[in-house]
Amino acid sequence: MAEEVNSPNEAVNLQEETAIAPVGPVSTWLTTNGFEHQSLTADHLGVEMVQVEADLLLPLCTALYAYGFNYLQCQGAYDEGPGKSLVSFYHLVKLTEDTRNPEEVRLKVFLPRENPVVPSVYWIWKAADWQERECYDMFGIVYEGHPNLKRILMPEDWVGWPLRKDYISPDFYELQDAY
């Protein structure tokens, strides 16, 4: 049964939702080597994006490192919204002699809001150290196996995860009433 479309914008949104993400070279390599993953639509710059389950992140990252992705350019997290997933992402770059056009891929791990746990990639890319700590501090994502997972920006006794979209600062209303 076809879905009813009431406007041109709804038609475009429906096409985007049902479109199959094109498979990039990294996804092809992962499939060839038996790594379970899901291809996502490339970002606005054309960077290939791949969704990975949390329990498969470490073996997949180890394989990508061996494949030549020797640089963790950025690791971060974001909140999709109240009641939705938290996302831990990893932007990897294959640094070679061709510095003008390096191969890039972004891995995304979608995590539940309650007990978000993902393995640490610190032992593969040391650059993940403070980045994983910041994501823990701001979103409450636990990076299992991290050597020093503690708050890095907020005071040690801070309650809650300030960058979650459902976070309400306990002092917000008191500060607002003071003015």
From Swiss-Prot:
Alphabetized SUPFAM superfamilies for the sequence: Nqo5-like
Function: NDH-1 shuttles electrons from an unknown electron donor, via FMN and iron-sulfur (Fe-S) centers, to quinones in the respiratory and/or the photosynthetic chain. The immediate electron acceptor for the enzyme in this species is believed to be plastoquinone. Couples the redox reaction to proton translocation, and thus conserves the redox energy in a proton gradient. Cyanobacterial NDH-1 also plays a role in inorganic carbon-concentration.
Keyword terms of this UniProt record: Membrane, NAD, NADP, Plastoquinone, Quinone, Thylakoid, Translocase, Transport
Gene Ontology biological-process entries: photosynthesis, light reaction
Family under the similarity heading: Belongs to the complex I 30 kDa subunit family.
Protein name per UniProt: NAD(P)H-quinone oxidoreductase subunit J
Transmembrane segments: none
Cellular compartment(s): Cellular thylakoid membrane
S-S pairs: none
PTM section of the record: In at one experiment the initiator methionine has been seen to be kept and removed.
